[in-house]
Each structure stands twice: as C-alpha cells, then as structure tokens.
Amino acid sequence: MKAAKKHKKQKLWSFSLLCLLMAVGAPAGVAQEASIDRVVKQRMSANKIPGVSLAVLREGKIVLLKSYGLANVEHQVSVKPETVFQSGSIGKQFTAAAVMTLAQENKLSLDDKIAKYFPDVPATWKDITIWHLLTHTSGLGDYPSEIDLRRDYTEAEYFAAFTKTPTNFAAGSSWDYSNIGYATLGILIGKVTGKFYGDFLQERIFQPLGMTTARVISEADIVPNRAAGYRLVKGELKNQEWVSPATNSTADGSLYLSILDLAKWDAALYTDRPLTQSSRDKIWSPAKLSDGTTKDYGFGWHLAQHHGHRLVFHGGAWQGFKSFIIRFLDTRLTIIFLANSWETREFKFARELVASFYPEFALPAVNTIADAEPKTTALARRALIQLMTDKIDEQLFTPDCRAELGASS
C-alpha cells in the first residue's frame, strides 16, 4: 500500500514537474500579449512616448519581445530589439554586481571603510563603508548644485566636489537615495582594479554574458542602433539636453543597453555567473539600519512584498530616457521596458504591464462623481486659472476676496 502511494506521488510529482518545465519559456498567452499591446499603446499616446522596447521572460527565457514606435523621430527609424537606449539608474545594479565580483575574489570587503581607499576624505566620511554606499545608507545625497552637468570634470574633480558635500545623517542610521554614492563606487572600482569601471564591466560582465551592445555612454562614438532621447517642452517634443562626456561616464547609471542585453542579464541572474548564490542573496536583502529597522533596498535593487509576491525592481531616468526592470523572485517572471521619453511614468507603466499577468496589481478604477452644479464648478475653475495667471476679473470675487487680493472694489 505504501509502495503504491509512493509510486502515485512520484507520478504526480513527475507530471507537475513536466507542466512546470513546459510553462517555463512558453510564449505569453494571446490575451496577455493583447493586454500588453493595449497598455503600451495607451501609455505611449498619453505621455507622447516616441518608442518602447519590451521583453517578458520566465526563468530567464524570453516569452515575449516587442518593439513599438520610433527610436529616432527626425529620421523616422523604428524601434527594434537591437535598439540601444540609455539605462538611467538601472545601471546601478551593474555597478553593484561589479563590486560583488570583487568581494567574491576577496579583493575588497563590503565592510571596508571608504577611507581605506581614499585616505584624505573628510571626517564625516570616515565611518562610511562600501556596504553603506551600496544600500544608500551612507548619508550622502545627490549631486551638489555647484556641479555643472555641462562641464567636463576629471574624476578627481568630481570626487573632490562629492567630499565637500555635507552628509545628511550618520552612516547607517537612515536611508537616502544617493547618486553620488554610486558614482563613488565607480571610482572605488577603479582604485581596486586599476581600470575604468566601464572597462571592468565590459571585461567581467558584459562580454562574458554576450551583452554585445552594453557599454558606457559616449555621444561622440558611432553607436549602431542608438535611440534618441526626448522631452516635452510646452507639449512639444524636443531632443534631450546635452551633458558633458564626464557626466555621462559615472557609475550611477550611465550605460547604453538594448532589451536583448537586459534579457541576457536576467538569464544570468539565475546562474552563478557572474554572481554566486550568496552574492545574489545579499543584493536582494533589505538594508538593516543601526536602530535595527530595515529599508526595502538591497544593492542596486528596490525590494517589495506585494500581493503575496516577492519582487525586486528598479527604474531609470536620464537624458530623455526611462527604463524599468521588475523580477518576481517567486514565480520567476521578469518584465523589462526601455522608452525614449522623459515623460514616461515608469512606475505606473510597470504596474500596468504587471497587471497583464497578475490582475491584482491593477490600479483601482477612479469613480467619477456627477457634478450637481456644473456652472459653479466652471466659475471656480475660471477663477483659479485667473489667480494662477494674475489676470483677475473682479466680478468673480466677493468684496472681501478683492480686498485680500489687493484689487479695488
């Protein structure tokens, strides 16, 4: 009897495993693809996004690869899977991965203080460790206002400006998203390896994984399939603003990537190359503060538990580009998109895409309320616009209001 039950369980287990294996890498369903098409086209129309590149993967295998719109509006070049976009801050996960490869080789420790590599840092930096920089718990903030993004600083000049910036809190005591923290990590990688951090990424991550178009940004170089970035100015589409080559070479998110490059990256995160299981566990663990509380951020990844799912994600925004990657660690589903418009609402866009697979993530519908007094509403709207433009029709306001506004009655 026990043997028969055991045999039955084995058959059930084998059948379940077969179903799982068939599901992994299976194409997205017709309804899901139609839903994604609808979401992308609605978002592109609403936010005037020229082009989008999108991939859906299960366990590192592409199940849906889509291209929408234009990579370059002026030349009417369509987006394709090989189109290269700017990364924005999703580039931080590659900086973190580079640091972790060095930690795996015992070339540095996450507990090392920055002063070990930069002895002349100010006293406020003395307690900052590599771990603090990775988790945004260093107390460092964003780029100081004195930095001119159009000026071509040397790496030493950048770092000198960083160290003059006051810290916001003691290292490890709180959390504050810090671009200069990740830019500092890039400089540190150079100190440890003797190589520019972008060259180290090429050698240790991009080339081994076959990410053939991934690289540090260079607007001067000839880059095949490069998309143009755009912004809206008073509703009109404009080219991205120019920044200096030095500004586009920092480790806080200055990469070129295609959707195919990111698909290969996602696949690699299911293997021990380049990151071991121990390293992957660390990059997706919440940062623990000195008071014992935690923040939902690992090393270059936001963390969340949502609707029973464990997920990691990050967005990016830079020079007329937006990007997003979200990975469900439990169901092994990944959704990635790259867009060439600053107006892309990347977090809302991502949630709408996720809802194609998990309806519980859908944003709640907004219930409209019937206006019982539309004429009064129209008058109020007109008065508000006048207040905003300083062109006031006195007859819309009571004598007391006119007195407050300084208008003569």
For every predicted segment, state its role.
Residues 1-10:
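N-terminal secretory signal peptides that target proteins for export/translocation
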Residues 33-87, 107-112, 155, 164, ...:
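Short, conserved catalytic-motif segment at the N-terminal edge
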